[in-house]
């Protein structure tokens, strides 16, 4: 279902059709434990589409992701306090990929958020802040 949702396209470029498409996508990749009601999700997506919808930019980003090979060498060069946060319920990027990223960054900490998918719904913000704020305090000490 994830690949099908990623490869799907809106019925047209009309804002409502684009919003429908992204509601379907976020329903597949979203956080199962931080559910956003469809009306709220649709309103947020429609506001974003109305503000700035650039399908060519989205396609460029997808092509860049697919063309990329590895950043392993670059990750080893990071020299600042690093926290890698990953959703345990992310259907798009496996948890092991987030763990691998953290392992490759010297001194990095890894935190997996239960019930978080490949999105940032309002409900997950508190869970992220619980791990992010202590990290920021330690980094600035």
Residue ranges of model-derived segments:
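Alpha/beta-hydrolase
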Residues: 1-73, 80
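Catalytic active-site module of serine/aspartate enzymes centered on a nucleophile-bearing elbow/loop
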Residues: 107-141
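Hydrophobic/aromatic residue at the end of a short beta strand that borders the catalytic acidic motif
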Residues: 25, 93, 120
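Short beta-strand/loop motif that positions the catalytic acidic residue
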Residues: 78, 84-86, 90
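Active-site acidic short loop of glycosyltransferases
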Residues: 79-80, 107
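Conserved alpha/beta-hydrolase "acid-adjacent" motif
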Residues: 91-97
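Solvent-exposed polar/charged
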Residues: 76-77, 103-104, 134
């Amino acid at each position: 279902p994830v690949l099908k949702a990623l490869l799907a396209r809106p019925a047209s470029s009309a804002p409502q059709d684009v919003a429908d498409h992204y509601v379907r996508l976020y329903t597949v990749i979203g956080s199962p434990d931080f559910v956003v009601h469809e009306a709220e999700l649709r309103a947020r997506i429609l506001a974003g589409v109305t503000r700035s919808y650039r399908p060519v930019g989205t396609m460029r980003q997808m092509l860049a992701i697919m063309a990329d090979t590895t950043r392993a060498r670059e990750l080893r060069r990071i020299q600042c306090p690093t926290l890698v946060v990953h959703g345990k319920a992310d259907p798009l990027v496996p948890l092991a990929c987030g763990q691998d990223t953290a392992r490759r960054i010297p001194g990095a900490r890894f935190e997996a958020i239960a019930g978080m998918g490949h999105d940032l719904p309002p409900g997950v913000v508190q869970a992220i802040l619980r791990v992010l704020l202590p990290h920021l305090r330690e980094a600035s000490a």
